[in-house]
Design a protein with these regions (language model features):
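Acidic, contiguous N-terminal accessory segments
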Residues: 20-96, 136-151
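Feature activates predominantly on carbohydrate-active enzymes
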Residues: 34, 51-54, 58, 92-315, ...
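Extracellular carbohydrate recognition and processing domains
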Residues: 686, 690-742
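Bacterial N-terminal signal peptides
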Residues: 7-16
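Structured mid-domain segments that build the active-site/substrate or prosthetic-cofactor binding neighborhood
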Residues: 254-255, 265, 375-481, 485, ...
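Substrate-binding cleft/loops of secretory-pathway carbohydrate-active enzymes
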Residues: 334-361, 405-412, 440-449
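Exposed low-complexity, polar/acidic, P/S/T/G-rich flexible segments that act as propeptides
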Residues: 733-798
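Catalytic domains of carbohydrate-active enzymes that cleave complex glycans
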Residues: 427, 453-692, 703-704, 710-712
Length: 798
């Protein structure tokens, strides 16, 4: 953060309660009275109006004086008004605090400069809001508040903090404003994410709909069906036909003309007034080749890059709009190793109105980008920075294990700090935060991540541990010191994590979640809760931080011995506490809306259901399911694993072994599944370790597909530490995580796999009930790849 000038008073930048005043000092309040009124600019925005009210309320809380508008008052604190004597244009993101005579002016550049500067002023008084629940640090009461002559300019290190979140309640909006968070739509005009079929809709996805990762069209184009009227706008597939499953045909000049016309339609429809704003041109969220047509491939050769046609399209759009809209910047993402992760190698400089956002989704999520293991992911960001005026950085603040997504038992604070500082050194001046870094859930250390990001966006060099202490003192009160030690231990574990931690691992593969560690941490939380007894606010904050731990205990329960389980005080106690925390959290999030009982009830239920989508299957598994068929009784050790369906919950089905199932489409093909392993440093990182197993219609014809659950033996194979039995043919990113069963002391041990499936007689649906895995007392040949040991064997247990 750059600061030019200071509050000209002795103690720091503001003096509160001074016993004597200099001639140039401004006495804001004395003895509970003030001559000052806080005045907003004419026609303030909602955020500016709310910030001015915050300023009045906070000054009154500190001094006891009323800073409301009163015609008898002769002195003013103006919000959003630039004094006539200040002729210097504001830089991007700059905020200024200036005194002219007895008046004070707070003003800034950009959509939220005038409200952000209010919180610069309040922060210098010692005011911090640290989370959406209202926890804060405020100075002691000051009957006399004096400041010196003011002349200060602040340019935040990273002016724009935005992400995958919008506020649904007033107190969430309040927190966003106080921390300087931009709502998702604040910075963008019309389009903020993947834009291909949103701007050039195929007609296959209705307005408001979504298929996979592709959303339906903007409202301006909801009646368009370009795949019918202009199929040439879409990529040519590998087999010579146009398809909506790849990207747009970005080399097509008619497509470019239509795209440009549609951008103009959006700008007009959104009443774009020429202010600083961004428009996303990001391609659709499909991996692989963009287009197989000869013109696109010619541009790939020209740019020496697989995204050559797309880059050429981007640069064309920049040329078309540069002069007419000088403050409009086009955004795109450096995303996916086989697409835009790396810049075009011969490009010397990006257009002035082009900004790329770097998305390091494939890096090791237990280490920062500055760690040697992530060198291959750090270099593309550095290469983009060399040709860019500025960058956007996508923040993935935590791992996203399936199916719990944003709630893993991790710290991921220091890694976040290191990544932000590395991105800043490489010209990142905007950050886009993915799940787990927005003020919409408060479990684990999510709120700390949000606050840390906000503080570092203001001042990238601010001390990390000071921020942690400031946050924890406010949130956990007497338990702050113990919470800091808990965080430090998790940080130490992550720093020494032995495996490459991908972005979406199986939660059960996280090695630090041993029964001994889980028990010790649970007992630590018991002690912390005893320290805050009598403070409902501190207790709720502790329970939120404890939720990730409780969830992991439930997930690991079937893998503990009975002796270990007995030490936790009962499974149902852990389940009740975890589920109770979800409800208490949701009610806190939507507090203040109880006057709309149906809305409040629906929102609370929806939030709880979203969080429980991953938890419920671990609860079901921990409680135990229906008995297995008698054929399994002869085995001493049997592991039962429920399916996961990406980040979605499972379907309820009383006939399923655990009452839950993954319902998907019938694939109507020969092969349904394969064992996939994640291998760091290999392209592609995911590889199939065995040929697809023959579980298609040919096999099912031997047994009647009667819609009932049946157990099919797949065969025996060894596994590796990060492996998944993949059923993506049934539903995207679905299957069974099996890597947690790997034993490094016996790496070639064979496991027998049996899958429980119900198949619709009419071949419309398939239901996955569970996977049964049996460790065998024999090994595969040393060095052998994971694979079937018996040719084409699929047995059926009725």
């Amino acid at each position: 953060m750059k600061r030019i000038g200071l509050f000209l008073c002795g103690l720091g930048v503001l003096v509160a309660g001074a016993s004597a005043t200099a001639a140039a000092d401004l006495v804001l309040a004395d003895g509970g009275r003030t001559d000052y009124a806080v005045v907003s600019k004419p026609k303030p925005t909602d955020r500016e109006f709310a910030a001015a009210n915050d300023l009045r309320r906070t000054l009154k809380e500190i001094t006891g004086a009323d800073f409301g508008v009163d015609k008898r008052k002769t002195k003013h604190i103006y919000v959003g008004v630039k004094p006539a004597c200040d002729k210097e244009p504001l830089k991007e993101g700059e905020r200024r605090i200036t005194s002219v005579g007895n008046d004070i002016y707070l003003y800034g550049e950009g959509r939220h400069g005038n409200d952000n500067v209010v919180y610069d002023f309040l922060r210098d008084l010692g005011c911090r809001w640290v989370n959406p629940s209202g926890d804060r640090t405020f100075p002691a009461k000051q009957p006399k508040l004096v400041v010196g002559e003011l002349k200060r300019s602040t340019v935040p290190s990273i002016p724009y903090y935005t992400g995958n979140f919008n506020s649904s309640t007033e107190h969430l909006k309040d927190f966003n404003r106080r921390l300087g968070v931009y709502e998702r739509g604040d910075l963008y005009v019309g389009v903020s994410g993947h834009a291909g079929q949103i701007v050039i809709p195929s007609g296959k996805i209705p307005f408001g709909g979504k298929v996979g990762n592709i959303k339906g069209p903007l409202k301006y184009f909801k009646d368009k069906a370009y795949f019918k009227t202009n199929p040439e706008f879409f990529a040519l597939g590998a087999y010579g036909k146009r398809t909506t499953e790849l990207q747009l045909c970005y080399s097509n000049p008619q497509l470019r003309d239509e795209y440009a016309r549609n951008i103009e339609i959006v700008l007009k429809g959104e009443n774009y007034n020429g202010e600083r704003a961004f428009f996303s041109l990001l391609h659709d969220d499909h991996g692989g080749k963009f287009c197989y047509c000869k013109n696109c491939e010619a541009l790939e050769k020209k740019y020496d890059h697989p995204a050559g046609a797309f880059y050429d399209f981007l640069f064309d759009m920049c040329r078309r709009f540069d002069r007419k809209y000088p403050n409009l910047t086009f955004i795109c993402s450096a995303y996916r190793a086989d697409q835009t992760l790396k810049p075009p190698p011969h490009q010397k400089e990006l257009p002035r109105n082009m900004q790329f956002g770097y998305s390091p989704l494939g890096c090791d999520f237990s280490k920062p980008l500055t760690h040697p293991i992530n060198a291959g992911w750090a270099k593309p960001l550095q290469d983009w920075a060399k040709i860019s005026r500025r960058m956007r950085f996508s923040v993935y603040p935590t791992t996203y294990p399936r199916p719990v997504v944003s709630y893993p038992l991790t710290a991921n604070i220091h890694r976040l700090v290191e990544n932000l500082r590395f991105a800043y050194r490489n010209k990142a001046r905007m950050i886009f935060c993915e799940f787990g870094s927005g003020p919409y859930n408060s479990f684990g250390f999510n709120d700390l991540r949000v606050y840390m990001i906000g503080e570092l966006c203001r001042d990238i060099d601010r001390d990390e541990q000071a921020i942690v202490k400031e946050f924890m003192d406010a949130c956990y009160g007497p338990a702050s010191e113990m919470m800091q030690k808990y965080l430090a231990e998790l940080e130490k574990i992550e720093a020494a994590y032995p495996k490459y931690l991908r972005w979406n691992p199986d939660i059960l593969t996280m090695e630090h979640a041993t029964a001994a560690n889980l028990l010790r941490w649970e007992r630590d939380f018991d002690r912390m809760e005893s320290l805050v007894r009598g403070s409902a606010r501190h207790l709720l904050n502790l329970r939120r931080a404890r939720y990730n731990l409780d969830q992991m205990v439930i997930a690991k329960w079937p893998y503990m011995t009975k002796e270990e389980q007995a030490k936790f005080g009962g499974l149902e106690n852990v389940i009740d506490r975890a589920c109770g925390t979800l409800v208490a959290d949701a009610k806190s999030v939507f507090a203040g809306t109880e006057d709309r009982p149906e809305w409040f009830k629906t929102r609370v239920e929806h939030k709880v259901a979203g969080a429980r989508s991953g938890l419920d299957q671990y609860i079901a598994r921990a409680r135990g399911g229906k008995p297995l068929p008698r054929q399994f009784a002869k085995y001493k050790t049997v592991y039962r694993i429920l399916p996961n369906r990406n980040k979605l919950g499972l379907d309820k089905d009383p006939e399923a072994p655990f009452g839950l199932c993954n319902t998907g489409r019938h694939p109507r093909r020969k092969s349904w599944l394969s064992l996939r392993t994640y291998v760091h440093g290999r392209k592609p990182a995911w590889e199939s370790a065995i040929p697809p197993l023959p579980m298609g219609p040919r096999r099912f014809q031997k047994q009647p597909a009667n819609g009932k659950y049946q157990y099919y033996r797949l065969g025996a194979m060894p596994i590796v530490p990060d492996a998944q039995l993949d059923f993506s043919a049934i539903s995207p990113q679905s299957g069974f995580g099996v890597g947690h069963l790997y034993d490094p002391k016996r790496p070639n041990r064979l496991f027998d796999f049996h899958v429980c499936v119900a198949v619709d007689p009419d071949k419309k649906w398939v239901k996955l009930g569970e996977l049964v895995v049996i460790p065998l007392d024999k090994d595969a040949a040393p060095g052998a790849k994971a694979g079937r040991t018996e040719k084409d064997t699929v047995d059926v247990f009725l």
